[in-house]
Amino acid sequence: ESIGELQQVAKETGATAIYWNRSFNPKIASRDAAMVENLRTSGFKTQSFRANLLLDPRAIETQQGRPYTVFTPFWKACLKQLNPPSPLPIPTSLIRPDKQPDTLDLHELHLEHQVDWTVGMRRAWAPGTSGANLNLKLFTRYALQEYDHQRDLPGVVGTSRLSPHLHFGEISPQQVWYAIAESGAAEWKNSQFITELGWREFAQHLLHHFPHTINEPLRAPF
């Protein structure tokens, strides 16, 4: 059980608080709620952050106090509220616990197969923050201005290639937002790329308010 393992690591390192980034996936949110209750009962301080989205899905609603179901009015409402905090600089140091928890080397888990099925991924992606920042830099410098039409051309590197980095938290949407803002692009808030970030926000908005959309359409006729 992940809760038990988390408690064990916290106890072994002498931690008194647990911090993490929220997920609005219904199943994960339910798991996290149970984890919070368990950890607080055990005496740990807990706090979560909205690091993977520009806005909390619970903060956007129609004038009738309901969640949005159509993208355009949703994104217009978001743009009126959006003022994401500036990204913090990379920390110069991290405090290590006096005692490291018992652990295994990755190779001891025997996760690698004899067939190297990851070779294609390694050629296409550079996992981690460095790879994410490089892709963002290359995109804003060389592809952003032509994104509207080059994104549909398979033979051209016309997209940001940031999707996996955003998914795994290797770069934040706040970093992307400010990079586009500082790129010098005209009317950047109304650009197609910023709108694509909006669709990402809208997907999480629907997932939070309409959890049945994991397996079913938002509207029954469809």
Walk through the language-model features, giving the residues of each.
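Trp/Phe/Arg-rich N-terminal binding region typifying the photolyase-homology
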Residues: 1-85, 189
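Glycine/tryptophan-enriched, flexible segments
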Residues: 65-221
